[in-house]
């Protein structure tokens, strides 16, 4: 007999699951991006620069959306996911920009930016997932990744634009460097942080039609905000560590620039810092998903055991067989049904 789970009870898998369109799109989009760069360089046509920005900024985040579409279940439609990506991305960067407009430079700047941006994405995730059924940690992680991908795409487009515009004209090399770095890091940046928050938020509401407040949601929000702040401040942290570890006095920094002798050390520490933050984020997400998976299996096992306890082995005349446990016939309580 097939056991009905929460996911199969709410419509099951979508018919377009597991078709591998995400990696096909990633590969073909990358080829289009390369061809666009070659044509731009060969023709010196600056009208193609926006195409490079859009392809480079949206390719990886939109691939994340396709990855989610092939795995999401329940009442979530493809249109809802695409809307969450585009509308959520636009509203996310606008809301974050408004919250960050009054922030002043200081030691806590990056941390405050992390709290502001994760708050905006969290609120958007609540709006997007309000009517989603079933609410499970896995569903929340997938929807959170979609909202985070939309935010990442529009934010990356802004960074790429700023990198391209200089006093000397369009700096194509700086533009491409910015796009490559942000494209490679986007899955372990905004996508990962919002996926963690979504997994905890939806996991807390498991089996319920509405979201449920628990302290774990607040803890998750603080954790992803701190990870976000550490990620953004990694450049400053790695620079300070380079001075401390090499014993170089801070006075050696002229006009706020790092001495050339420390360039390699700073780069190494920067990459190591990003790797550490990424590993912590992935470990947190995997831990949350495994915790809720075990919890779901325990609940399902208890439900099966409770329902089975009301079954009475009967003989051919509707009378319990000899030796069978005598069980009073009565209506089981509502929580068993």
Enumerate the predicted regions with their spans:
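Hydrophobic alpha-helical segments at protein termini of multi-pass membrane proteins
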Residues: 1-337
